[in-house]
Amino acid sequence: MNSTEYIRLCLVKRNNMSVAELAEKTGQTRQNLSNKMQRNEWKQAELEKIAAALDADLDIRFIDHATDEPII
């Protein structure tokens, strides 16, 4: 699962929050956020804003390809 897919799942878990609502909460336009989601290119600062908008903490982990488990 890539970062954008994970963000979309989180939006569903947060009472079906829309991309427009997330964009507003992160201080950007819906179009700008949609473009970032299409490219699936995120800076850590952007992910931190999204986490804050979702009332969550950002947890970055490396996942082993063979086992699909976190390395640490």
Label the model's feature ranges.
Residues 12, 38-42:
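Residue-level detection of the helix-turn-helix DNA-binding "recognition helix"
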Residues 24, 59-72:
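Short, charged recognition helix plus adjacent turn
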Residues 34-35, 48:
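Key DNA-contacting residues within the recognition helix of helix-turn-helix
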Residues 45-60:
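DNA major-groove recognition helix of helix-turn-helix/homeodomain DNA-binding modules
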Residues 15-33:
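Short alpha-helical DNA-recognition segment
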Residues 1-21:
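A short, Lys/Arg-rich alpha-helix, primarily the initiator
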Residues 18, 43-46:
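Residues that mark the N-terminal boundary/hinge immediately upstream of a DNA-recognition element
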Residues 10, 25, 36:
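Residues in the recognition helix of alpha-helical DNA-binding motifs
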